[in-house]
Amino acid sequence: MAHFQNQYSAPEVTQTDAYGNPTRRTDEYGNPIPTQETGRGILGIGGHHHGGHHGLHRTGSSSSSSSSSEDEGTGKKKKGLKERLKEKIPGNKEHQSQATSTTTPGQGPTYHQHHREERSDGQDQGEAPWSPQPLISCLWSAISY
Protein backbone atom coordinates (compact mmCIF):
# COMPACT_ATOMS: atom_id res chain seq x y z
CA MET A 1 0.00 0.00 0.00
CA ALA A 2 2.99 2.26 0.00
CA HIS A 3 2.20 3.32 -3.55
CA PHE A 4 -1.15 4.84 -2.44
CA GLN A 5 0.50 7.38 -0.21
CA ASN A 6 1.11 10.77 -1.86
CA GLN A 7 -0.85 9.71 -4.91
CA TYR A 8 -1.45 13.31 -6.06
CA SER A 9 2.24 14.26 -6.06
CA ALA A 10 1.89 16.72 -3.22
CA PRO A 11 5.28 18.00 -2.13
CA GLU A 12 6.70 16.16 0.82
CA VAL A 13 6.96 18.11 4.06
CA THR A 14 10.42 17.59 5.43
CA GLN A 15 10.78 17.17 9.16
CA THR A 16 14.49 17.97 9.13
CA ASP A 17 16.47 21.17 8.66
CA ALA A 18 19.21 21.72 6.08
CA TYR A 19 21.72 19.84 8.25
CA GLY A 20 19.49 16.81 8.76
CA ASN A 21 18.49 17.67 12.32
CA PRO A 22 14.88 16.84 13.21
CA THR A 23 12.58 19.85 13.45
CA ARG A 24 9.07 20.36 14.73
CA ARG A 25 6.56 22.70 13.23
CA THR A 26 5.12 25.22 15.68
CA ASP A 27 2.21 27.63 15.56
CA GLU A 28 2.50 31.37 16.19
CA TYR A 29 2.53 30.77 19.96
CA GLY A 30 5.38 28.26 19.85
CA ASN A 31 3.16 25.23 20.44
CA PRO A 32 4.04 22.14 18.41
CA ILE A 33 1.70 21.33 15.55
CA PRO A 34 0.77 17.65 15.55
CA THR A 35 1.60 15.74 12.40
CA GLN A 36 -1.30 14.42 10.40
CA GLU A 37 -1.66 10.68 10.55
CA THR A 38 -4.20 8.45 8.89
CA GLY A 39 -6.91 6.88 10.99
CA ARG A 40 -7.77 9.99 12.99
CA GLY A 41 -11.03 11.79 12.75
CA ILE A 42 -11.39 15.36 11.59
CA LEU A 43 -11.49 17.87 14.38
CA GLY A 44 -15.10 18.87 14.82
CA ILE A 45 -16.45 15.53 13.67
CA GLY A 46 -15.82 13.27 16.62
CA GLY A 47 -12.23 14.41 17.04
CA HIS A 48 -10.75 15.65 20.27
CA HIS A 49 -8.74 18.79 20.55
CA HIS A 50 -5.86 18.45 22.98
CA GLY A 51 -4.85 22.10 23.00
CA GLY A 52 -2.89 23.86 25.62
CA HIS A 53 -3.10 27.32 27.05
CA HIS A 54 -3.00 29.81 24.18
CA GLY A 55 -2.63 32.99 26.26
CA LEU A 56 0.38 34.36 28.06
CA HIS A 57 1.39 32.48 31.15
CA ARG A 58 3.01 34.73 33.74
CA THR A 59 4.86 33.70 36.82
CA GLY A 60 6.19 35.64 39.76
CA SER A 61 4.69 38.49 41.68
CA SER A 62 1.86 40.60 40.41
CA SER A 63 3.56 43.86 41.29
CA SER A 64 4.55 46.28 38.61
CA SER A 65 8.02 46.07 37.18
CA SER A 66 8.49 49.78 37.66
CA SER A 67 10.61 50.62 40.67
CA SER A 68 10.00 54.34 40.45
CA SER A 69 7.88 54.37 43.61
CA GLU A 70 10.66 53.12 45.87
CA ASP A 71 14.23 54.23 46.27
CA GLU A 72 16.95 51.74 45.33
CA GLY A 73 16.82 49.19 48.13
CA THR A 74 16.16 51.59 51.01
CA GLY A 75 12.41 50.99 51.11
CA LYS A 76 11.66 54.71 51.24
CA LYS A 77 9.26 56.15 48.71
CA LYS A 78 10.73 58.59 46.25
CA LYS A 79 9.14 62.00 46.14
CA GLY A 80 7.12 62.60 43.05
CA LEU A 81 7.14 65.81 41.07
CA LYS A 82 4.02 66.97 42.89
CA GLU A 83 5.64 66.64 46.33
CA ARG A 84 8.83 68.35 45.17
CA LEU A 85 6.82 71.24 43.75
CA LYS A 86 4.85 71.63 46.96
CA GLU A 87 8.11 71.99 48.87
CA LYS A 88 9.42 74.65 46.50
CA ILE A 89 6.32 76.87 46.17
CA PRO A 90 6.65 79.99 48.33
CA GLY A 91 3.00 79.82 49.50
CA ASN A 92 3.50 76.41 51.09
CA LYS A 93 2.64 76.14 54.83
CA GLU A 94 6.07 74.76 55.70
CA HIS A 95 7.74 77.46 53.63
CA GLN A 96 5.75 80.19 55.43
CA SER A 97 6.64 78.89 58.88
CA GLN A 98 10.31 78.83 57.95
CA ALA A 99 10.33 82.31 56.42
CA THR A 100 8.30 84.24 59.00
CA SER A 101 10.57 83.97 61.99
CA THR A 102 14.34 83.93 62.17
CA THR A 103 16.56 84.25 65.19
CA THR A 104 19.71 86.25 65.36
CA PRO A 105 22.10 85.58 68.23
CA GLY A 106 21.55 88.17 70.95
CA GLN A 107 18.60 89.92 69.29
CA GLY A 108 15.69 87.50 69.46
CA PRO A 109 13.30 86.65 66.61
CA THR A 110 12.66 89.06 63.75
CA TYR A 111 9.45 88.98 61.76
CA HIS A 112 9.09 89.80 58.08
CA GLN A 113 6.22 92.05 57.10
CA HIS A 114 4.45 92.40 53.78
CA HIS A 115 4.85 95.91 52.42
CA ARG A 116 1.83 97.61 50.93
CA GLU A 117 2.14 100.18 48.22
CA GLU A 118 0.34 103.49 48.47
CA ARG A 119 -1.20 105.26 45.53
CA SER A 120 -0.24 108.83 44.70
CA ASP A 121 -3.43 110.13 46.35
CA GLY A 122 -2.42 108.59 49.70
CA GLN A 123 -4.81 105.60 49.70
CA ASP A 124 -3.63 102.05 50.33
CA GLN A 125 -3.49 100.03 47.09
CA GLY A 126 -2.86 96.61 48.62
CA GLU A 127 0.01 94.25 48.02
CA ALA A 128 2.46 94.67 45.18
CA PRO A 129 1.46 93.04 41.89
CA TRP A 130 2.19 89.34 41.69
CA SER A 131 5.16 88.20 39.61
CA PRO A 132 5.41 84.67 38.14
CA GLN A 133 9.22 84.69 38.19
CA PRO A 134 9.67 83.05 41.65
CA LEU A 135 7.23 80.30 40.73
CA ILE A 136 8.98 79.64 37.42
CA SER A 137 12.37 79.36 39.11
CA CYS A 138 10.87 76.96 41.68
CA LEU A 139 9.43 74.80 38.92
CA TRP A 140 12.74 74.61 37.07
CA SER A 141 14.67 73.72 40.20
CA ALA A 142 12.12 71.00 41.08
CA ILE A 143 12.18 69.48 37.61
CA SER A 144 15.96 69.40 37.42
CA TYR A 145 16.10 67.75 40.88
From Swiss-Prot:
Where composition is biased (Low complexity), the residues are 58-68
Comp. bias intervals (Basic and acidic residues): 82-96
Q: Which GO terms describe its molecular function?
A: metal ion binding
Q: Which UniProt keywords apply?
A: Repeat
Q: Name one Pfam family in it.
A: Dehydrin
Location of region: Disordered: 1-136
Q: Where is the composition biased (Basic residues)?
A: 47-57
Which N-terminal stretch is annotated as signal sequence? none
A GO biological process of this protein is: response to abscisic acid
**According to the UniProt entry, which residue ranges have a biased composition of type Polar residues?**
1-18, 97-107
InterPro entries (UniProt xref): Dehydrin (IPR000167), Dehydrin_CS (IPR030513)
* Other observations noted: This is a SET 5b protein.
Q: Which family is this sequence assigned to?
A: Belongs to the plant dehydrin family.
Role, per record: LEA protein are late embryogenesis abundant in higher plant seed embryos. There are two subsets of LEA proteins (5a, and 5b), the first ones are expressed when the cotyledon weight reach 80 mg and the second set are expressed above 100 mg. The function of those proteins is not known.
The entry's protein name is: Late embryogenesis abundant protein D-11
Tell me what organism the protein belongs to.
Gossypium hirsutum (Upland cotton)
- Lineage of source species: Eukaryota, Viridiplantae, Streptophyta, Embryophyta, Tracheophyta
